[in-house]
């Protein structure tokens, strides 16, 4: 047999709670299958979502504080040991009796029997909470607040996973991710210097020529991620090596219509991204793991505002689109439409190897540019 259930609780417009549960016995199988998988499985998940801004005064109507939490558990209990026809409960009973015959206490024998049972089971427990798309929405109608703080969007999430399986006695992984983005649409600041040339031959074709002094939009972002994985294999006496991740990526872009209704009317799109690693900050000079407080002291206000580690990759892209407009002689512009695009890409990578010979062999920078007309 197999069972599945779910329930949902809505808390008006404040949030919701959703829970799901499923369970199946070892012999359950679908109609198109002849046998079950001989594994008893249980799954449980609960999801919570809320909007914390609903508790703020009405003046903070532009504030966004979404929050979510998820807890999930999966438990698999096989009837037989992996890749064999040995019944797990029978093997546990044999181990218990063997320990009793050796003179062990019932508690010690039961501990050995439980180890036999646990070794064949798979247990996964996951937790995650997140706040994504956070906007402060400070209720001050002044450009210094409206165009700075209120244009910032932030997000943070944390997740952790515990696992026990026939392969690992335990594996624990945690990770957090933080991002902050600032985007701004700039008001047009332009001039039209040829409005007087309506009756002038040739030049009059560009009477609506406009020069823009500011980009139309600009955005920048910072993305940081840190995580760690530790595990103990059932086939090794010592724990496996700690897997660490600590990286940052910063990026920016803008789009700028330099001119409009002119001879070329170029539109410049520029973006760059730089990736760096902060993994060297994880360990001190003696190879010991630094605490979060020690790492933060190395990152902030330590000779500079923020230390984002060693740069390992950098990319820049420039795209210029233009639409040539020729003087309107004899109405030819009605039949002519020309476009062009110029692109330039720059890429730089540094393997961050301590061996200079290896570092210099792998480190490289490339520049590619193309021009097309139609």
Description of each model-found segment:
Residues 1-374:
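Exposed, low-structure sequence patches enriched in small/polar residues
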